Amino acid sequence: MRDPLPEYPWDAMEPYAALAAQHPEGALNLSVGSPVDPTPAAVREALAHATEAHGYPATAGTVPLREAIAEWFERRRGVTVEPGAVLPTIGSKELVALLPFLLGIGAGEAVVFPRIAYPSYAMGAALVGADAVAADDPAEWPEHTKLVWINSPSNPDGRVFDVAALRTAVERARELGAVIVGDECYAEFGWDAPWDSERIPSILDPRVVGDDHRGVLSAYSLSKQSNLAGYRAAFVAGDADLIAQLLTVRKHAGLMQPAPVQAAMVAALRDEQHVAEQRERYRVRRETLRSALEYAGFRVEGSSAGLYLWVTRGVDAWEAVEELARLGIVVGPGHFYGDHSPNHVRLALTAADAHIAAAAERIRAAATLAA
């Protein structure tokens, strides 16, 4: 039998959530990156119109969906992929956790992911008995590596890989004979120069791989850009042979995205206005929260893109979590993201405008009182 899995990290937040709930003005939860803004009307309408879905959905995705994904890659990422080289997934977390299994990776092989990373990468390795290796430097990737995850923009620290860094990573993965995957679900949210005006590069960018997608995949989710976390709407694209392999296993496993969700995705992918509006919401929230945190002595590190502020004041993360919980603010400790960020906390921008404003006010007021 497999070794017991670790406890779900966020379960450890219960006492701090309880402490925050005691605040006289209520708790403000900034610990989870779950969207709170409305799902675009056109997307909801597309879903509603597709509810006559009595048959099993297409595991490969409908033709309109595959075409919409390919068009989106060309338009938004500057990447050319064929409709036959894309595959819808039931959210992106499912893919992250299951990809080692889907690729047939097992004991004696390694899955590599960032040193500071969302825990699902390591969990995917654990589920198949593979070695989980947290390493950013491609030179440190072991010879038995079979899968490499690149997260750009990254969660939690908002790091962005430029073209040169992506090219180096791809070249090293190919030397090792490993599949390399870019987890790119925050690509629409670049904040600091140059990403406030330049397109964040995909791992499939022709400047990275030319026209050769061999061994390379890009994963993307509509949860954040389109407020579709409840729909479980995501996809993966790239190496056509790998996509075919994943499709075969997913057919056997019954991993099918519901037909109404596929219809909703087509609408979301073809409408850019709602994405621009959502980006502006997050920009304002980010500025509001960042200003207050810096006023209170927190240092924002990284956070050049994505939906989080990654901050530190030099104390243990749990101490900072408790301090903010006493203000009624729930945040995530750096310990959740590996062993290399014990003094950081993550604050999500996925809270209502009023909640972000209230959190900023509480942080400022407490800092002023302590001065």
Where are the model-predicted features located?
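The alpha-helix within a helix-turn-helix
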Residues: 70
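Conserved donor sugar-nucleotide recognition element shared by glycan-biosynthetic enzymes
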Residues: 9, 13, 62-65, 92
